[in-house]
A protein has these predicted regions:
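N-terminal glycine-rich "phosphate-gripper" loop used for MgATP/nucleotide binding
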Residues: 109-112
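Glycine-centered tight turns that cap/initiate beta-strands
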Residues: 62, 86, 101, 178-181, ...
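N-terminal secretory signal peptides and thylakoid transit peptides that target proteins
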Residues: 1-19
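Conserved SAM-binding strand-loop segment of SAM-dependent methyltransferases
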Residues: 87-92
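N-terminal Rossmann-like NAD(P) cofactor-binding module of classical short-chain dehydrogenase/reductase
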Residues: 105-106
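Beta-strand-loop-alpha-helix segment that lines the small-molecule cofactor/substrate pocket
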Residues: 115-163, 177, 430
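N-terminal Rossmann-like dinucleotide-binding module
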Residues: 15-83, 164, 174, 255
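Contiguous beta-strand/loop segments that form the cofactor/metal-binding neighborhood of enzyme cores
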Residues: 169, 178-181, 186-188, 194-411, ...
Length: 444
């Protein structure tokens, strides 16, 4: 649905409906569960992200951790501290896959482990929650989609913007036509500190005794133990996907969700470089990408910067206004897309022609008696609950129980990851790239 203009009353009614009963929003709530509905999960990877997922998951009703696996022994201790002292822990993640009492896997492992983890989990009959980005490469993603579809198991990708209340409101407002014809979508995020640039301090006790370094490297060419690579793997393309896979994927996933897009971009062009963090990394710390999406070639411009602090934000532009989404706040700045006065070009008309034109213009465009004026002032609202990780994990565990679809399945996650891979490929190839659906490859 697309209206030519919206009055203030119409906008408030529509946005309230989109907000789900009130502009104030509603906090996330869980349904009551019987003890028989308890889901037992195995945790693979108890690092920075994994420890957070583990702690959040065990607080959800009807969810219990049956065991944890990590190649670094210090994280066995951490898992026991988070869950319980007698939690079974191991370096061998396959023990969790082989355990028939475990319903599903929550995995937070380096990107270069995602394909192996997903394929082996679903092949073992386990549903899996895999951290973003879904894949390390486009080819890995294709293989993962095939494996999940063949197995019939459930996969949820851990990019939580699709479970954000504020993104859901934006999605409904866009679907109702409040923005008119979409013209451009922008998204950005910036950080400006060592932690934000992944310069994490390696564990002081890291050694070949406390870490199975050889297995950690997976199928990447072997090298001697490097504690910085272990802690900062996101900085190297051999193990991670850089700002594209770690940060851009959130912007892309949220954009796909809000705009109702579930396909890879048609085209991508990137620029950037290592501008701030000259620490040996080979992934850019500044990365800007322009995409074209869909039949209308909608321009989408995304930029990431690890040298300047900027809040994560979207600016969705249309013929009837601009919608800005940041954190738990949404702001709509309406535009009529129409002249408010007769065109100043008529000043070049002779007097009689100008007077006649302007009289006719006012007759056709001035508000009539009883007609509501269009919305002109900016309107904002916020939600009180912005912890989108909880509902995202809850959606996964509910799907494990009920076998209903998840909000971010393997196809959605693959398409979001492809946008990130295209951003990286365009950057490293220094040319525009396209997605070739026939060969399922990125071409330039």
């Amino acid at each position: 649905m697309k209206k030519p203009t919206w009055s203030r009353r119409e906008f408030l009614e529509a946005s309230a409906a989109a907000a789900g009963v009130s502009l104030a929003g509603q906090p996330f709530k869980f349904r009551a569960l019987a003890p028989s509905d308890t889901v037992r999960f195995g945790m693979v990877g108890v690092g920075m992200q994994g420890s957070g997922l583990l702690g959040t998951s065990i607080q959800l009703p009807g969810v219990t951790c049956a065991g944890a696996a990590d190649l670094y022994d210090g994280r066995h201790t951490l898992a026991k501290e988070i869950v319980r002292p007698d939690l079974p822990t191991t370096r061998e993640y396959r023990r969790l896959l082989d355990d028939k009492t475990i319903d599903c896997i929550v995995a937070a492992v380096p990107d270069h482990w995602h394909r192996r983890m997903v394929v082996e989990a679903v092949s073992a009959g386990k549903d899996i929650y895999i951290e973003k980005p879904m894949s390390h490469t486009a080819a890995d993603g294709v293989a993962m989609v095939d494996a999940v579809k063949k197995s019939g198991r459930i996969l949820q990708v851990g990019s939580q913007r699709v479970s954000s209340q504020i993104c859901a409101k934006a999605k409904d407002m866009i679907a109702q036509g409040m923005l008119g014809d979409l013209t451009l979508v922008e998204g950005w995020l910036g950080r400006n500190d060592p932690t934000g640039a992944w310069e994490y301090p390696p564990p002081p006790d890291l050694s070949l005794k406390t870490l199975d370094w050889d297995t950690w490297q997976n199928d990447v060419p072997k090298r001697s133990l490097d504690p910085n690579i272990f802690a900062r793997w996101r900085c190297w393309k051999e193990y991670g996907t850089g700002v594209a896979g770690d940060l851009l994927v959130h912007l892309i996933s949220g954009m796909q969700f809000m705009l109702g897009i579930n396909e890879p971009p048609k085209q991508a062009a990137s620029m950037g470089g290592i501008r701030r963090w000259k620490d040996g990394r080979n992934m850019p710390d500044v990365h800007a990408t322009m995409y074209y999406y869909g039949a209308t070639d909608l321009p989408v411009y995304m930029r990431l910067n690890l040298g300047t602090e900027m809040p994560e934000q979207y600016r969705i532009q249309g013929s009837q206004g601009v919608l800005e989404v940041s954190g738990n706040t949404l702001t709509f700045s309406p535009q009529t897309g129409k002249d408010q006065w007769p065109s100043y070009y008529t000043g070049s008309y002779p007097h009689a022609l100008r007077e006649a034109y302007q009289a006719q213009w006012h007759k056709e465009h001035d508000l009539q008696a009883g007609q509501a004026p269009p919305l002109t002032e900016t309107v904002s609202f916020s939600t009180p609950d912005f912890d989108d990780t909880r509902p995202h994990l809850w959606n996964f565990f509910e799907a494990v129980r009920t076998r209903k679809p998840v909000v971010e399945d393997v196809v959605f996650g693959h398409n979001a990851a492809l946008a990130c891979h295209m951003a990286n490929e365009a950057y490293f190839r220094r040319t525009t790239v396209t997605w070739d659906e026939a060969t399922k490859t990125i071409r330039s």
